[in-house]
């Protein structure tokens, strides 16, 4: 026997909001907005890291490496943002543009991958001693 829950009426006139079909354009828009917020957060984080590294000055251990990696990450994020705007402006429903959209989407995905890898290295090179070990090292310098 099927329960009433399994027989959901997907007609647009249905009064139950749970039984309404999903508007895929609305879903994609909400997903894009959420991803954009994460992109902005990463951009702000990298800008703050760059500021901190520049304030420490060239005497810090990985100064040149961190400035280079953070700058490259920021540049890639700007390029990805421009690429995503171009992708959003092209109409997916036009068959002659679908191949180009697919290529642009692949390029954006590859650039995002490189950005993630670069940010892993930024985190690795930017790690500082914290907590117990940092307090012990400051009391007993080698």
From Swiss-Prot:
Stored InterPro entries: Ninjurin
Entry's free-text remark on domains: Composed of 4 alpha helices: 2 hydrophobic transmembrane regions (alpha3 and alpha4) and 2 alpha helices (alpha1 and alpha2). Alpha1 and alpha2 feature one hydrophobic side and a hydrophilic side. In contrast to NINJ1, does not disrupt membrane integrity. NINJ2 filaments are curved toward the intracellular space due to cholesterol-binding, preventing circularization and ability to mediate plasma membrane rupture.
UniProt-annotated stretches for the region Helix alpha1: 25-37
Entry GO CC: plasma membrane
Upregulation: By nerve injury; in Schwann cells.
Ranges annotated as spanning the membrane: 61-92, 97-126
Residues in the Cytoplasmic compartment per record: 93-96
Residue segments, region Helix alpha2: 38-57
Membrane topology: Multi-pass membrane protein
Assembly notes: Homooligomer; in response to stimuli, homooligomerizes into filaments. In contrast to NINJ1, the filament is curved toward the intracellular space, preventing its circularization on a relatively flat membrane to mediate plasma membrane rupture: curvature is caused by cholesterol-binding at the cytoplasmic leaflet.
Tissue specificity remark: Widely expressed. In adult, higher expression in the bone marrow and peripheral blood lymphocytes, medium in the lung, lymph node, thyroid, uterus, thymus, spleen, prostate and skeletal muscle, lower in the liver, placenta, brain, heart and kidney. In embryo, higher expression in the thymus, heart and liver, lower in the spleen, lung, brain and kidney.
Regions of compositional bias (Polar residues) in chain numbering: 12-21
Pfam families: Ninjurin
Subcellular location: Cell membrane
Extracellular-facing ranges: 1-60, 127-142
Protein name: Ninjurin-2
Protein keywords: Cell adhesion, Cell membrane, Membrane, Transmembrane, Transmembrane helix
Molecular function via GO: cholesterol binding
